[in-house]
Amino acid sequence: ASSFQYFPGVPLFHSKDLIHWEQVGNCLTRPSQVSLQGASIWGGIYAPTIRYNDGTYYMITTNVTDKGNFIVHTTDLYGEWSEPVSVKQGGIDPSLYFEGGKCYLVSNPDNCIQLCEINPMTGEQLTESKRIWNGTGGRYPEAPHIYKKDNWYYLLIAEGGTEYGHKVTIARSRHIDGPYESNPANPILTHINMNAQGNPIQGVGHAEFVQASDGSWWVLCLAFRPQTGYHHLLGRETFLAPMRWDKNAWPVVNGDGTIALQMDVPTLPQQPLAKKSPRTDFKGEKLGPEWVHIRNNHPENYTLVSGKLRLKAAPVSLNDDKASPTFVGRRQQHTDFTATTSMQLQKASPADEAGLTVYMCESSHYDLYVKQLADEKQAVVLRYRLGELTHTQKEVIVPQGKIQLRVKGNNEFYSFEYATDGKNFRKLDKMNTRYV
């Protein structure tokens, strides 16, 4: 999945039945693999693609803040990935296709889909880039992938941008470098038409095909779920839908080219995962793969000691748009949730602060934190940053010692609470979800 300004980059998930998924690691775990300094929420890592060939996994992606398109590889999905090799062909959303000992790269430089042959181990471009399809006329043709079936090369792309006009289109050719014939029934997946106007899923696009072990075909795509009005809370999420792909035919997604929150289809034999505790006790030697930092972190500021996570304060705030603050966080996975932490300031100077934040980017975040005061007292503070506006919503003096901070979320509001005894939480205020 895209990881933008967050480090480690490119979270990697695994499933044996396409239903139960678990994160098994991240592809980019070392600063030498990815530089995110100066990356905004719109920067960093875009749209990775993973491919397997002859015993090796390849991941190709784009660092739009630094060196553009690059590849890393591994023979062990649970281990470390290689150092990156850059590729010459530009654009975003690169993808790889392997056939006959050759590796082909497709991406979208110059607002069209282009193809070239490369060496995936060195990144060297072996042939000139060739324009192979412009799409169907929608803006931003991107996210290309090539599949071969029944001696046809199928070229799958996204068009229309990533909001409500998003769509998936497809073309095919007898030759990998074209010419490609557009599907007369394009788009094969979209929610821009009247038949999906009231669908709770919108902005559907950027798709991949996968064939399961039983021969069934599935499509994975990105979309968002609007909450109130045009606001969507969890960003672009990954959806899975059934697909029929008959011999020599065009693929048909879920019967009518739309998807739903519930779709009744035969499934693979289910292999549920062991239930994990929602609690993180910090008793391991390192943080789990789900924890991330803003940009490349400073490891010396993070220590796991006796079941506690010790964070060293730094002179970089959450408002900084270039450097890395002392921050460790998790992506919000659910509309309704509760997040609680027990914390204590130690060796703090006046104005030092630490706490919980609901963070979208450096200019949009809600902060619930404990602040050290000059008279050896401390305060629990609720503050927000929205664009150019920073405001302290509420501040309460509390005794020195451990403080419990809690954020409760739903589709409309985040509620911010604190406790000094670990049991009796007091609500400071609630903030609207639409602004972050």
Predicted feature residues:
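Carbohydrate-active catalytic/glycan-binding domains of CAZyme proteins
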Residues: 1-436
